[in-house]
A protein has these predicted regions:
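Nucleotide-activated sugar donor-binding and catalytic core shared by glycosyltransferases
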Residues: 1-375
Length: 375
């Protein structure tokens, strides 16, 4: 390689920041600029603005933050034009990624970069098998390459001419071979409370978690891992709780999973981590009522938890929308606490192990190797 290639990398949430850092670590011979969080910045990335500005989820929530997102889109387009990277690598945050690329294609300077070889790669294939299958065609028009988590996703995109590479689920990079699975019997009754990494979801779930915690019989320890974007809010919120949970850094969450008897968790990335670590859990999610209604209309799958979808059965009980309340959580908590139910759930979670990762190679390294081969 004669010249050091430049990658403009964009991560919009914590899981993307972790994967982005793993990719950067595996590509020391490339220069990285862009948008990231604490993990990527620890490796030298100077984020052009706080990653938390992109951590918005839900149709209504995105509309509420439309002005800020528009400003960040324009800022990112300008930065890409000014820095002239060889590759734009986007990790999740598909709405933002597609808006940036669309803006570049409409900008004369952006079109000039594209004509000179600028490529667009995206990590995380949208779940077109679950809802809005038309997105596959749109992705094919937007990106030059797509990295999917699972083999079965590939045909949905290659039929439209989009080169798609299955790489396994990146969360497995931080779990497989590093942490032992949960044992089916726990002496210390530790319950992990996982309200999510986006402020919008945290604000909706924390009051529900408080009511749940205060209704659980004595004898349990509650622990909440926090990320930098939500830590201050969560610490302030729990000050008024009658039962005080322990607050730990998100960096310590895998050790928490090893010890946890059970978890109550927001739908999303954390539910995948819990499943990989064989932690019995109850999945909850409380979004804006209109977002929930639209989701019920558009989604074509019975469950939101990936482990439930992959195994085509309800392993993790799900409480979504108005069902996500303290009373229902407590009912499920009591049910899953039963020794037989608890052991059966762990056994079911172990059945998904082979689906998360095709081999022993790290996902971040696999993506890095593929990119290096292209350049």
């Amino acid at each position: 390689m004669r010249n050091k290639k430049t990658v403009f990398i964009i991560a919009g949430e914590v899981s993307g920041d972790v994967l982005g850092a793993n990719i950067m670590r595996a590509m020391p011979d490339f220069k990285f600029i862009g948008i990231g969080g604490q993990n990527m910045c620890a490796l030298g990335l100077k984020s052009i603005f706080p990653m938390s500005d992109l951590a918005v989820m839900g149709i209504i929530e995105v509309v509420a933050h439309a002005r800020t997102l528009k400003q960040r889109i324009n800022q990112t387009i300008k930065e890409i034009i000014d820095t002239k990277p060889d590759l734009v690598l986007t990790i999740d945050s598909p709405g933002f990624a597609r808006a940036v690329i669309s803006g570049l294609r409409k900008n004369p300077d952006g079109r000039d970069l594209i004509s000179k070889g600028l490529r667009f790669y995206h990590i995380v294939a949208p779940q077109v098998w679950a809802w809005r299958p038309g997105r596959a065609k749109k992705y094919a028009k937007t990106f030059d390459k797509l990295y999917s988590f699972f083999d079965f996703e590939v045909p949905y995109f290659t039929k439209y001419g989009l080169k798609t590479v299955p790489v396994g689920h990146p969360i497995s990079d931080n779990i497989m071979g590093k942490y032992k699975s949960n044992k089916s019997v726990r002496g210390d009754k530790i319950v992990a409370l996982m309200p999510g990494s986006r402020m919008t979801e945290v604000k909706k779930l924390m009051p529900i978690f408080r009511d749940f915690v205060e209704s659980v019989p004595m004898g349990y320890r509650f622990v909440i891992p926090t990320v930098e974007t939500t830590d201050k809010y969560i610490r302030k919120s729990v000050k008024c709780w009658n039962v005080q949970p322990e607050i730990i850094s998100s960096d310590m969450r895998y050790k928490l999973y090893q010890q946890a008897f059970m978890a109550v968790a927001a739908s999303g990335t954390v539910s995948v981590e819990l499943a990989m670590m064989h932690v019995p859990a109850i999945i909850v999610y409380r979004m804006n009522w209109l977002t929930t209604l639209i989701g019920h209309i558009l989604v074509n799958v019975r469950w939101v938890s990936l482990v439930n979808i992959l195994l085509n059965k309800e392993i993790y009980p799900e409480l979504l929308g108005t069902k996500a309340n303290a009373k229902n959580i407590l009912n499920q908590f009591n049910r899953v606490s039963n020794a037989d139910t608890h052991k059966k759930m762990i056994a079911e979670l172990k059945k998904a192990d082979k689906l998360w990762r095709p081999d022993d190679n790290l996902v971040g390294e696999r993506i890095a190797s593929d990119i290096r081969n292209d350049f």
